[in-house]
Structure formats: structure tokens, C-alpha cells
């Protein structure tokens, strides 16, 4: 099995990249794909760049060139569900766009034409992620993760997203685009991200301060998954 891993930023993939043996590097547009072995397992690690378009470009290149059997999206997220704190883990059961709106034509909020309203994560991958996170002593919340091309940093923005998607756990900028590409290529995926901020007015300062912790927590979980896949 070859495991595909996607992170947007250099900080989000650095730990995993540095553990990779026999590493090769391929650049496609703004994306970088590192291939090699981690703990003896074949891994293709994508640093996609930030945002939905960059994530879609990179994930398409990853699936076409490296041909992984599954995809794990790692990195950081804003925690909006009650009780989440910095360093906690969110695992996707499904992902949706919070900034897509074609409701004028009868689609659900967040749904794009010719696509499902939600992209469902692979249950086996999500179950495995939850099992490993709990064994590692990490605090975990599982459910809906919403994506959009905005860094959420105000209570008003959170309130709007929660009004549209009451069950949302975390918000970020790439996961649903990655999920849409995986759906199109019929490749199982899951999102495992660590909370870096609360999406509120202090989010930008919190993100800068706690991104290294979020990267460490999410990378530890991904490493545990690699060992089991």
C-alpha cells in the first residue's frame, strides 16, 4: 500500500518529510510531492499550498503521479465546536464547503452541481485515526469539517457558519477540495487536523503561536496511522 498525505504549508509537512527515507521530490505548478518510505511504508507526501485551488491542483497531481491507495489530509484547523481547545484533534466523517452557494437552483448550502452536498470520509480510515488518537492520549472530536477560502477570525463569521452547518467541528481552507478530488478519483480519504485557534478575533495571533503544536500533534497521529496501514 502507498499512503498519500496532504498538508498545505511547509510547517504542516516538515516533521513527516524529515522522517522520510530515500526521499525524492517532484514539483508540479505550486505543489511539491515528496516520495519515499516512513517506517518502512511507501508514502507520497504533498505540500499543496494554501487554499482550495492549490489543494485541488496538488491532490490531482498526487493521485495521477504517485497513485496512492488512500489520502490523509493533515495540518491545522480552527476549532469551532464546543469544548475544543488548541492541540485537540478533529477527524472528518464528512467535509463540506462553507463558502459555496448554488441554493438558487435547489442545491444544499455548500453543494456544487454534479457533486454530493457532503464528501464522506472513509470509515475505516476515520475509525483508525480515532483509535490511534485516543491511544496517544489526544482529545478527539469527530464529525463535519468545513472548508472555504477564508481564514476565519471573527465571532460573526463563526456564527454564520454554525447557522448554515450546526454540526461543524472545525474550519480550514483545503480539506473539502482534497475530498472532492479524491471523490472524483474514487480514492478513500480522511482529514485529521489539530486545532491551532478558535476561529475568533484572536485567531490570527493564536494560529501563529500554536501552528507548531498543531503540526506536531497531527503529525504524531499520521505516523501512528502509517504504522497500521
Swiss-Prot record:
Pathway: Amino-acid biosynthesis; L-methionine biosynthesis via salvage pathway; S-methyl-5-thio-alpha-D-ribose 1-phosphate from S-methyl-5'-thioadenosine (hydrolase route): step 1/2. Coiled coil: none annotated. Keywords: Amino-acid biosynthesis, Hydrolase, Methionine biosynthesis. GO terms for molecular function: adenosylhomocysteine nucleosidase activity; methylthioadenosine nucleosidase activity. InterPro entries: MTA_SAH_Nsdase (IPR010049), Nucleoside_phosphorylase_d (IPR000845), Nucleoside_phosphorylase_sf (IPR035994). Substrate binds at residues 78, 152, 173-174. GO terms for biological process: L-methionine salvage from methylthioadenosine; L-methionine salvage from S-adenosylmethionine; nucleoside catabolic process. Belongs to the PNP/UDP phosphorylase family. MtnN subfamily. This is 5'-methylthioadenosine/S-adenosylhomocysteine nucleosidase.
Amino acid at each position: 500500500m502507498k499512503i498519500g498525505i496532504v498538508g498545505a504549508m511547509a510547517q504542516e509537512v516538515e516533521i513527516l518529510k524529515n522522517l522520510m527515507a530515500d526521499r525524492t521530490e517532484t514539483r508540479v505548478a505550486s505543489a511539491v510531492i515528496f516520495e519515499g518510505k516512513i517506517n518502512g511504508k511507501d508514502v507520497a507526501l504533498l505540500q499543496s499550498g494554501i487554499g482550495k485551488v492549490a489543494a485541488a491542483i496538488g491532490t490531482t497531481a498526487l493521485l495521477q503521479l504517485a497513485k496512492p491507495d488512500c489520502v490523509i489530509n493533515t495540518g491545522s484547523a480552527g476549532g469551532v465546536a464546543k469544548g475544543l481547545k488548541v492541540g485537540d484533534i478533529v477527524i472528518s466523517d464528512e467535509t463540506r464547503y462553507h463558502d459555496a452557494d448554488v441554493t438558487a437552483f435547489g442545491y444544499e448550502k455548500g453543494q456544487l452541481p454534479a457533486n454530493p452536498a457532503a464528501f464522506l470520509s472513509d470509515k475505516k480510515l476515520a475509525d483508525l485515526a480515532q483509535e490511534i488518537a485516543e491511544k496517544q492520549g489526544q482529545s478527539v472530536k469527530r464529525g463535519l469539517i468545513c472548508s472555504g477560502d477564508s481564514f476565519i477570525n471573527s465571532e460573526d463569521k463563526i456564527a454564520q457558519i454554525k447557522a448554515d452547518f450546526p454540526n461543524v467541528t472545525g474550519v480550514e481552507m483545503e480539506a473539502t477540495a482534497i475530498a472532492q478530488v479524491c471523490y472524483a478519483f474514487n480514492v478513500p480519504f480522511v482529514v485529521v487536523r489539530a486545532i491551532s485557534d478558535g476561529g475568533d478575533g484572536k485567531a490570527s495571533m493564536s494560529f501563529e503561536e500554536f501552528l507548531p503544536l498543531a503540526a506536531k500533534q497531527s503529525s504524531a497521529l499520521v505516523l501512528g496511522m502509517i504504522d497500521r496501514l
